[in-house]
Design a protein with these regions (language model features):
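Conserved acidic catalytic loop of the alpha/beta-hydrolase fold
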Residues: 69-86
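Gly/Ala-rich beta-loop-alpha elbow adjacent to hydrolase catalytic centers
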Residues: 90-94, 98
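Acidic catalytic loop of the alpha/beta-hydrolase fold
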Residues: 210-215
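Catalytic histidine-centered segment of alpha/beta-hydrolase-like enzymes
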Residues: 238-251
Length: 256
């Protein structure tokens, strides 16, 4: 396993087991550590986790960030690692990045997995996300509110170590908070380009938790109907971070 920085100072971890690598893209405000349950379960596969621009150990100094910036980040990382083909897994903002990547670099993808993605938000849904973004701009702590949306109360009671990990990840110093806001702004104001989405022909699996209030089952079903070569699986009893709370169910589908 290599844990290192590429020439562009992107932090990554690469476990090379000789298979087509599975690349994981985390969500806004998080980092590569959110995928621990998947990496442990997929220990016989080649896997890559990395920190997005302005997240975790990867720096970012520009005033704004775009999906194109994030897609180019991944292209450059793959070029550095000399990898031509991947399976790509994106969560939340990561799924929007994964779709953008797929629309531009389908030749690099074997399969695409979108987890907890948003799609065709209603005006009410959009305003709720923008309200949370505006709270974040005022430096109001969102950590505990976010965890209530992402996990069930019962799970966090049984797994205090998960609670502690995500409080640590979400508790930003001022410079990290500024970069967090850049990505949060992108996520909150995102509008789907349906014409581009309909051109993606990569075999795609879409998953979301049955109790995910922000990235709903209805959104995922709608996306699946617009993606030509896709299927949808509802993760029973899962909230937004069903990849952790319902890791066994998610991992079985990743392996399949």
């Amino acid at each position: 396993m290599s844990q290192n920085f590429d020439p562009n100072q992107n932090y990554y971890s690469f476990i090379d087991n000789g298979t087509t690598p599975i690349v994981f893209i985390h969500g806004v405000g998080l980092d590569h550590k959110m995928w621990r349950h998947q990496i442990e379960s997929l220990k016989d596969y080649s896997t890559i986790t990395y920190d997005l621009l302005g997240h975790g150990k990867t720096p970012y100094n520009k005033e704004e960030v775009s999906l194109n910036d994030f897609s180019n980040q991944l292209v450059l990382l793959l070029k550095f690692l000399k990898i031509d083909k991947i399976n790509l897994v994106g969560f939340s903002l990561g799924s929007l990045i994964a779709l953008d990547f797929a629309s531009k670099f389908q030749n690099k993808l074997a399969k695409l997995i979108l987890l907890g993605t948003t799609y065709k938000r209603t005006e009410k849904e959009r305003s709720q996300v923008i309200d949370r973004f505006n709270q974040a701009k005022l430096n109001k702590p969102l950590s505990k509110q976010a965890l209530k949306r992402w996990f069930s109360d019962e799970y966090l009671k049984i797994h205090p170590e998960v609670y502690d990990l995500f409080i640590e990840i979400l508790d930003k110093d001022p410079k990290d908070h500024i970069n967090f806001l850049k990505s949060y702004k992108l996520f909150a104001n995102h509008k789907d380009n349906i014409d581009i989405i309909k051109k993606v022909k990569t075999k795609t699996l879409i998953m979301t938790g049955s109790n995910d209030l922000g990235s709903t089952v209805a959104m995922s079903k709608s996306l699946s109907s617009d993606l030509i070569n896709s299927s949808f699986i509802e993760v029973e009893n899962g909230k937004h971070l069903c990849s952790i709370e319902c890791a066994d169910d998610v991992n079985i589908n990743l392996k399949n």
